[in-house]
Amino acid sequence: MAAGAPAAGARRGGSEAICNLVICNDSSLRSQPIIFNPDFFVEKLRHEKPEVFTELVVSNITRLIDLPGAELAQLMGEEDPKLPGANSTASGFFRSLMSLKRKEKGVVFGSPLTEEGIAQVSQLIEYLHKNLRAEGLFRVPGNSIRQQILKDALNSGTDIDLDSGEFHSNDVATLLKMFLGELPEPLLTHKHFHAHLKIADLTLFDEKGNKTSTPDKERQIEALQLLFLILPAPNRSLLKLLLDLLYQTAKKQDKNKMSAHNLALMFAPHILWPRNVTANDLQENITKLNNGVTFMIKHSQKLFKAPAYIRECARLHYLGSRAHTSKDDLDLLTSPGSKELQPLKSQKRSRLDSCHQEETQQRTEEALRELFRHVHNMPDSAKKKKLIRQFNKHPSALTPSSDVATPPAPRRARSRSFSGLIKRKVLGTPVIQERKSRDSTPEPKRVSKENVHLLQKCGSPAHMSQGKLKSLEGQKEESCRRMRAHLLSKDSSSL
């Protein structure tokens, strides 16, 4: 799917519901775009559990507008809608009967709305998107002969090349209105008629709590969002395509001279007025209905998004308990490549959590390294030994990282090396290699500092006697023991 075409599926007629899609090309996601539908759980609940979904939406509609028992039952589909006009019910019955006959013949015009009909009409909408600058669009009638040719072609399902120049934009615009006007019921349905009248009455309140004449746009948008959620799927799909077309047309009113209000006057009788009623039947409601359609055109870009609380309720319905997880959901979670197709919000949250954990771990390691340096540089004391013992109790948590290497323990001078040096200096005899020591300390490559000082005190080896040599060896052994004990204590300190 290409970015920037969220309604492409609906224009082709291949989708059953409007999907608001967000396409992300985040480089951290292996350069694979992720398509995320924020209303996924809303549409899932709508298709899998329509009764639960309808009850959820209608309960929130009644919170915004006051619907008496009869009108609420009509909205829920429990009663037939009672519409203005004495013969509205009977004429509606015969009109529905005629539409069924037309549907059997595969006729698009005059038949109930289907995906096939939307696919045919979407050709007209796409063509009009390219010709929005025509002055008087949707107001100036086209040529009736060309319109009949185009209508027959749509009913027969033949391919039409609207860009060939054979048809004018006014022909196509008039035919689109004709299609909407010949539907068995208006695009916004009869059972929603009274709800739209109540939405038009939503106004702001003053400081004293009294109603004013200023429309409450936020509540009206919220009510329309909810009402559009319970429209039949084909009606909702075509309504979105139509309102988007009218919105784009009104944006070019400096060229086509068609404002949102002018467009509402053209389309309100086709998409909102009940069938077979006159202006006298509607009386004072005509202004409300026209203003309502004007409001829909101006705010069409906001009306097909589910309110945030509906999204949250639908999400909790499926994710709040493992018992709600279906087999299809489990297959989706375990399918190959599901990690790359996780919702964008979940991946973003996981990335933020991992970054936060890395920052916290980095700060902890820096603090531990600083503490380790401080303790290591302390002079030998009881306090230092106590801290070292505490370090030894938790080696994994308090061991500094590899960039701060533990200073190596100084190598101990071996007594055999010093003894061999004395014998070579005094006796001039070769030294026999002694057996290897049990400990793993390797032979030092140089004489320790203390042994060098001791050797310098001995004077010339040529004048040294055997007794003096034994005395020096005894001193050497004692010095080695002290030095070995001192080095052992330093080894423990370094650990």
From Swiss-Prot:
Instruction: Locate the compositionally biased regions of type Basic and acidic residues.
Output: 350-362, 433-452, 470-481
Q: Name one Pfam family in it.
A: RhoGAP
Q: Which InterPro entries match?
A: ARHGAP19_RhoGAP (IPR047941), Rho_GTPase_activation_prot (IPR008936), RhoGAP_dom (IPR000198)
Q: Which residues form the Rho-GAP domain?
A: 98-304
Supply one GO BP term.
regulation of small GTPase mediated signal transduction
Domain of life assignment: Eukaryota
Query: Where are the annotated segments for Disordered?
Result: 327-362, 393-495
Per the UniProt record, the site (Arginine finger) maps to: R139
A GO cellular component term found in this entry reads: cytoplasm
Entry keyword set: GTPase activation
Q: Which GO terms describe its molecular function?
A: GTPase activator activity
| Function noted in UniProt | GTPase activator for the Rho-type GTPases by converting them to an inactive GDP-bound state.
Q: What is this protein called?
A: Rho GTPase-activating protein 19
Organism expressing this protein natively? Gallus gallus (Chicken)
UniProt lists the gene as ARHGAP19
